[in-house]
Amino acid sequence: MTPFLTTTGGGSVRGFGRRRPVPSIPIPIAMTIDYLLVAGGGGGGDGNGGSRAGGGGGGGFREFAAQSVSTQTPYTVTVGSGGASYVNGNNSVFATSSAAGGGHGAYYGGGAADGGSGGGGDLYGNAAGVGNTPSTSPSQGYDGGIGGVGGGGGGMGGGGGAGAVGGNSSYGSRGAALGGSGGAGAVSSITGTTYAGGGGGATWTDNNSNNNTAGGGAGGGGTGGVYQLANGTNGSANTGGGGGGGTTSGGSGIVIIKIPDTRTATFSGGVTSSGGSPSGGYKIYSVTATSTTNETVTFS
């Protein structure tokens, strides 16, 4: 190959062949985002065929504003699944932040669990679960309600919600003992939607005549069951609602990400998401499921 000679000022540069362009390397750019984490709701206490169980606690609710991130950097994103009967919900995660799964409700064979919001207690002396566990500021959830109020045939406590403590059971006669309502969830400033309501506690009766049910908290909490008549209902999917007292599952959580409309979010293959259309200067993405705990989102 014949070398070429290029003159530059008073000197020259000798080389071989043709110069190749230097590839462009994207430079990370700082940006700010808002995001919401709602963990999976706790399952209702195991009714063992009879719904003598406290409601599950709503998943932890944590909202973050004006958080600094960089483009070209992958960030972990995980949506927590709801807990099965007598099982806590699973955590939701973005980057290094997490919301804790809701605690399961109590039943005659075991106590309620602590969690994002605590599970409801029962009439057998099993205490309600403690919310905001682990502790965050602001609080990610509240305690479950107390069961067996007044003694005798009192009902079961409602699960705590992200916005309020679970309701205590009410006591009349054995045929009129109601479970406590699930604690209300919290409203997201990003979406305006209420999430992470607690599940209603089960009603206890020994004469099969009381079919009154305790409602779940606003934000997807399931309805409590009635002993010997009906199991409770599950927490609603993608709300983090706790399951109603009696052989129920909590609802799955959700991750919401709000970014400037000049930017785009790209998710890894195991992420189920929707949204992303520009509106009012922003794009809002809803992440409703992740297939592994190693899924990511990258901004550009």
Annotate the PLM regions.
Residues T2-P23, T32-S300:
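Low-complexity, glycine/proline-biased repetitive segments and flexible coils/loops
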